[in-house]
Amino acid sequence: ERVRKYAETNIYGFDFDPDLKKAARMNMVMAGDGHANIFHVNSLDYPNWEDPNELEKIKASIKKSLDKMQDIDNNYTDDARGKFDMIFTNPPFGAKVKVEQEIAAKFFLSKYSDAPEVLFIEACYKLLKPGGKMAIVLPDGILGNPNTLPVREWILENFKILASVDLAVEAFLPQVGVQSSLLFL
């Protein structure tokens, strides 16, 4: 019961794919930790999400969570930016994933790349509390490609790198063939 209450109050999930949202909720129900706070939104477009109903649900959920926490360091707004202690994310990456130009333009890092995995780094940074932690799956190209040096420099300016874990090529879908790492910031 304690785990379920904690999950309902403190754990949030956002996904652009409505089927993955449903799968996550079902997984939570089966694990016995509730099914609240899983939303179908484009994480890169916060706070201008297309579905105003989802945005209102998120605002209400954050407000409920803040009311229960009684966190005196928190400014008690329903804006999600700066509210998360930890973020765990596996952003979409690959040639098929495109970000609309008007969304990409919101991000400083779009000067260097409009790839969603690059923009997710900055989007998550904006959602974290000062001192918050993040674990993000990234293609190794970001970590070693000479063209992404400005992105790595931005990461170093804004985060402390805690660990980088190489993942097996088979870690995700078979035959995807993208070498990736789990970066702890």
Residue ranges and their predicted role:
Residues 1-157, 161:
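SAM-dependent methyltransferase catalytic region
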Residues 5, 176-179:
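A short, structural micro-pattern
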Residues 160-170:
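Conserved S-adenosyl-L-methionine
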Residues 170-176:
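AMP-binding (ANL) adenylation modules
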Residues 179-185:
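Conserved beta strand-loop-helix elements of the APE1-like EEP
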